[in-house]
C-alpha cells in the first residue's frame, strides 16, 4: 500500500496523453483503419506506383499521388470526398492534423 501511495503522485502528474502528437500521426499514417496511407502515398508522402496493369495493348499505372505539398485544409477536404480507389477513413480533424504534421516533419528527409 505504501508503494502505491509513493507512485500515485507520479502517475497523476505525468502527461495525460498515452502517446505524443508525433507518435499519433505516425501511427495513423502507417495504419489509420487497417490500410496504411504509406502503401499508396509512400513512407514520406512522396507518392508511388500502386500497381501496373494492362488495358488492351497498353501498360498503365495506378499511382498514389504525392501529398507532401498539400495544405492542411486541402487534406481535410480531400479526405471527405469519394475517391475511386482510396478507402474512406472517416478521420477526425485532430487525426488529419496529426497525419499532416507527421508528413510536414518528414519533408526534408528523402
Locations of regions flagged by a protein language model:
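Gly/Gly-Pro-rich "capping" loops immediately C-terminal to redox-active cysteine motifs
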Residues: 38, 42-78
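C-terminal capping alpha-helices of c-type cytochrome domains
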Residues: 76, 88-110
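Glycine-centered loop/turn positions within well-structured domains
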Residues: 35, 73, 84
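Electrostatic cytochrome c docking/interface patches
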Residues: 12-33, 110
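Sec-dependent N-terminal signal peptides
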Residues: 3-13
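Soluble non-cytosolic domains of exported or imported proteins
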Residues: 19, 31, 69, 89-94
Amino acid at each position: 500500500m505504501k508503494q502505491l501511495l509513493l507512485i500515485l503522485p507520479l502517475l497523476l502528474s505525468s502527461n495525460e496523453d498515452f502517446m505524443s502528437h508525433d507518435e499519433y500521426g505516425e501511427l495513423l499514417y502507417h495504419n489509420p483503419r487497417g490500410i496504411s496511407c504509406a502503401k499508396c502515398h509512400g513512407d514520406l508522402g512522396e507518392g508511388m506506383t500502386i500497381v501496373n496493369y494492362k488495358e488492351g495493348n497498353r501498360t498503365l499505372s495506378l499511382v498514389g499521388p504525392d501529398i507532401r505539398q498539400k495544405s492542411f485544409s486541402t487534406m481535410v477536404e480531400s479526405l471527405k470526398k469519394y475517391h475511386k480507389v482510396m478507402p474512406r477513413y472517416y478521420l477526425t480533424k485532430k487525426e488529419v492534423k496529426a497525419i499532416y504534421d507527421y508528413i510536414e516533419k518528414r519533408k526534408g528527409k528523402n
